[in-house]
Amino acid sequence: MARRSEGKKKRKILTDRGVVHIKSTFNNTVITLSDADGATILWSSGGTAGFEGTRKGTPYAAQLAADKIAKEALRLGIKRVDVLVKGPGPGREAAIRTLQAAGLEVDSIKDVTPIPFNGCRPKKKRRV
């Protein structure tokens, strides 16, 4: 007898709150929507928005990725989000503005960019 393969089970989202993680680098912007525990619900990036190469790092690519996340979040019933921003890229502000404009209520914006407390020695000319 053939075994039935079990696919991924979609979890029902029971809350109207979520956390949006925006990781913005100079090459790309990755936006992830998770629940309060940190479990990923959905994600999008400059690449999944249809951009390739250096255009993935543009604010416009981040805007399209954030719009996709916001529309899907509203469809799932998530209305209020906390935003955690990481990285120095150009897509940070564009993504936050798009989330607000799309109808999500942004409760807080927090910068969680990792900064070393005198960690590893920078290479060559990068020493300041």
UniProtKB/Swiss-Prot annotation:
One of its GO terms (molecular function) is rRNA binding. It comes from the Bacteria. One of its GO terms (cellular component) is ribonucleoprotein complex. InterPro entries: Ribosomal_uS11, Ribosomal_uS11_bac-type, Ribosomal_uS11_CS, Ribosomal_uS11_sf. Gene3D superfamilies: Ribosomal protein S11. Keywords: Ribonucleoprotein, Ribosomal protein, RNA-binding, rRNA-binding. GO terms for biological process: translation. Part of the 30S ribosomal subunit. Interacts with proteins S7 and S18. Binds to IF-3. PANTHER family: 40S RIBOSOMAL PROTEIN S14/30S RIBOSOMAL PROTEIN S11. Located on the platform of the 30S subunit, it bridges several disparate RNA helices of the 16S rRNA. Forms part of the Shine-Dalgarno cleft in the 70S ribosome. Belongs to the universal ribosomal protein uS11 family. This is Small ribosomal subunit protein uS11. The lineage of its organism: Bacteria, Thermotogati, Thermotogota, Thermotogae, Thermotogales. The gene is rpsK.
